Amino acid sequence: MKEKKNKKFALGVEYDGSYYHGWQSQKGLSTIQSEIEKALSKIANHQVNVICAGRTDSGVHSIGQVIHFTSISFRSDFSWIVGVNSYLSKNISVKWIKEVSENFNARYSAISRSYRYIIYNHKCRSAIFRNRSNHVYKELNVDKMYFEAQSLLGEHDFSSFRSSGCQSRSPFRTITDLNIRRLKNLVIIDITANSFLYHMVRNIVGSLIQINDNTKKNYIKKILDKKDRNYAGPTVSARGLYLFFVKYPMCFNLPIFKDDFII
């Protein structure tokens, strides 16, 4: 009897992280990874293990998570998507699937990752946006925040924005894009880098929120130059953070699924 050949697949996943203990599987806890692996295993009729582009913390959301897995089972793309989604809660959804070459790796093949942080900026908190954004009651100076944030562009030692417990060997990262805009009561911060340190985005946002009309010029640059976590702002809530998009080389021809507005 001919042995079935393993095939590798990439999968695009969207999820609301409010109800899970982060991405990574943990014994006795409900996580995004464990839920997806259980659903995939049922459809594949064998144990499936997945690798993701970026492990998100408890409370962090995603519309752009990419994972890969291997399977000996044959299913159409439609059958994979509908089948897996039927075993997932409504807080997790598979958006696309594509067979990929053996050399594809969801984590190591990624060129860059983009995160979005959403702040509900109003004197009164929102019940609707409670788990989708971070509430800041003082009015934020978005123009000044944007100006200060530009000092983070390029390759730097981001030790000032690196939380304890970070397992990365190097504090150097390269931010290629950082944009901040206001949409009525929402302040939207988009950051793209080759990769991120532990809590790096949330610590950057925590520092930007400290900026006000009286903040002296080069506030963020001075924090960056200190290379000391004690000088940066607090780590902001996970509920405002989204893994927005993961970029891969064109040769893999992965679908691009990127919503501009994700509340």
Swiss-Prot record:
Q: Could you list this entry's UniProt keywords, alphabetically sorted.
A: Isomerase, tRNA processing
One of its Pfam families is: PseudoU_synth_1
Q: Which GO terms describe its biological process?
A: tRNA pseudouridine synthesis
Q: Tell me the active site.
A: D57 (nucleophile)
Q: Which residues bind substrate?
A: Y115
Task: Kindly give the InterPro entries that the UniProt entry links to this protein.
Answer: PsdUridine_synth_cat_dom_sf, PsdUridine_synth_TruA, PsdUridine_synth_TruA_a/b_dom, PsdUridine_synth_TruA_C, TruA/RsuA/RluB/E/F_N
Q: What is its EC number?
A: 5.4.99.12
Where on the tree of life does the source sit, at the highest rank? Answer: Bacteria
So what does this thing catalyse? uridine(38/39/40) in tRNA = pseudouridine(38/39/40) in tRNA
- One GO molecular-function annotation for this sequence? tRNA pseudouridine(38-40) synthase activity
Q: Does the keyword Isomerase apply?
A: yes
Could you tell me what this protein does? Formation of pseudouridine at positions 38, 39 and 40 in the anticodon stem and loop of transfer RNAs.
Q: Which family does it belong to?
A: Belongs to the tRNA pseudouridine synthase TruA family.
Cross-referenced HAMAP family: TruA (MF_00171)
Oligomeric and partner information: Homodimer.
Q: What is this protein called?
A: tRNA pseudouridine synthase A
Q: Gene of origin?
A: truA
